[in-house]
Amino acid sequence: MTIYTLSHGSLKLDVSDQGGVIEGFWRDTTPLLRPGKKSGVATDASCFPLVPFANRVSGNRFVWQGREYQLQPNVEWDAHYLHGDGWLGEWQCVSHSDDSLCLVYEHRSGVYHYRVSQAFHLTADTLTVTLSVTNQGAETLPFGTGWHPYFPLSPQTRIQAQASGYWLEREQWLAGEFCEQLPQELDFNQPAPLPRQWVNNGFAGWNGQARIEQPQEGYAIIMETTPPAPCYFIFVSDPAFDKGYAFDFFCLEPMSHAPDDHHRPEGGDLIALAPGESTTSEMSLRVEWL
């Protein structure tokens, strides 16, 4: 495992080639993402990529253009093919400078055969990450992208992200029924604290922008996705699930498609890529000092 360090002014970024994950993002000594453990395990990191799609496909199967495809579980602790392969694979460095890095990963087994590049770039106040995935298989398939960033959480943390509804969670951490009425504790259309309880829900009607305020540290993070991501997930763990969890981090995950879009007509917001075709998504995290 190799750790690549980028810096620009007071910003510093650590990225690992194992999983293509971010292992830390700081302004001087202030963590802007949860510091990673540099363990080689993506769920211990600060952020990991979601490719060739995000979240899960119920039943580990989908029908596309008249053909049925069967996915296989890819981690021991989940019954589903979870978050794709990029977060579990070994990436290769193709370029590295003081403030920029580009990694690539190729996957040639299972249903999806593809090549993905992930470019990181720092400016004085912004981290920009760009994912570009190319279908290297023999068939047209539905693709999506996203990221799984972990943010510091305190009682003072506030988040704001537009939504017109959300999916309930059902068994095996799958997205369930869609509800247009947001409960007060999950309504982030205006800045609001996160509930001190388990949350694992997707939100629809997003404009691709979010604001995460950390007043105790004197800063806010402004997330922006290009093209605007239509969905985000909020994850807050629980000590009953993770014995070491102390309500000290949460995830706000931008996704280019809704959960389980493989089962929606024409793949929902998933993008059909013919062999050789590509799709690109970008996430920026801008630091604003309060």
Curated annotation (Swiss-Prot):
Organism listed in the record: Escherichia coli (strain K12)
Gene3D superfamilies named among the record's database cross-references: 2.70.98.10
Listed name of the protein: Uncharacterized protein YphB
An example molecular function term from Gene Ontology annotations: carbohydrate binding
One of the GO BP terms on file: galactose catabolic process via UDP-galactose, Leloir pathway
One Pfam family linked to the record: Aldose_epim
SUPFAM superfamilies, alphabetized: Galactose mutarotase-like
